[in-house]
Amino acid sequence: MKTLRLAIHGRVQGVFFRDSMRREAQRLGIAGWVRNRTDGSVEAAVQGEPAAMDAIVRWSYHGPQHARVERVVIEPDDGSYNSFEVIG
C-alpha cells in the first residue's frame, strides 16, 4: 500500500471539498483523512492500492464542482489508516 499527504490549494473551502473527497475515497477503497487548514487549503492523507491512489490524486486536482484548485503539493506519508474520515 502506498500512503501520501496532499495539500490542496485554491478555492477549496466552503465548496464541500472534504465531504466530496470522503465519498470519492470510499468509492475507491482509499483510507485516510481530510481536513481544512487555517491557511485556506485542504490537507489529506490517503492510503490505498496504486490504481486507486492515482485516481484520488487526479480527482484532487479538480475536486467537486465549485472548487477551483490552483495547486496540489504531494509528499510521502508514513501513516496507517483503516477508514476515511473528515477531521476538523
Regions of interest found by a model, annotated:
Residues 1-88:
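Intrinsically disordered, low-complexity, mixed-charge
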